[in-house]
């Protein structure tokens, strides 16, 4: 039931690791406001990191967890000082990414540095007409997560709040710092296998929380594509799945029959820029991350087009550029999130 398995403790949270999300939600619904407040203050780690707990409670509990993390840092070295700055930023107010006046608190749905877990909701879920969950790739760490947050907020801003985007760091990602790490880290399926069940559980929670008729898109970028594809084999819940410059379609995925999304009408899309270095590992025979999603039957392949400055979205820089630079590719990603059918029709690759 937990995005990051909550530690077992006494009292009302003791049974959570073995309870369904629905049962956890029911248990909390039966509590008085005073009992809920006490639950947050007495068990912030469990409340802040367990699926089934109402999201406002998770956010409130994680403010306690983040404040505690600040206090545990010594500030004696550069790494500690950077963490303190990051954690204080998580506690601070930000301009509303939807463009509405005023400043708002950040909405942290999971925070556990010991498990490399940080999940943040960007945007107003009550106002959103579409929701996306963004799973990033190699070299992602809590300490370097600000770039993912900026990417997510850009989609919220572009839609004036009609889209909400969740950044999902559900555990450790491969860290590639030199060529050897490409083999020992990026090619290691263990990270995908470990994170996939947590993503499956979180997607179930998203499905329960998001309003009826609001589509949810799960996006896997780079190594995150393997995580998302692996989660699809285990019962991910999404209305749309987007493989973005994905390392593969998922560990052990050879064809669409290996995916078992809980939504039988899920739509799947894939986009990789021409000349992206990820092409060298996509779909290699016996590869650790499964088949190439760009070539999978039933998956709609999308073209990347050009940047707004006129250059083609292609080559190694396009691996992250498609997510972070104004371009046809970026607008197509947004079209997947919002369900803009005409834009997707224009971007669909012709076989």
Stretches found by the model and what they are:
Residues 1-116, 122, 126-129:
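Intrinsically disordered, low-complexity charged segments of secreted bacterial virulence
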Residues 116-117, 165:
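Short glycine-rich loop/turn motifs
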Residues 124-126, 137-214, 232-351:
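Lipolytic serine-hydrolase domain surface
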Residues 120, 229-230:
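Contiguous, well-ordered alpha-helical segments that form the cores/surfaces of helical PPI scaffolds
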Residues 219-228:
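Gly/Ala-rich beta-loop-alpha elbow adjacent to hydrolase catalytic centers
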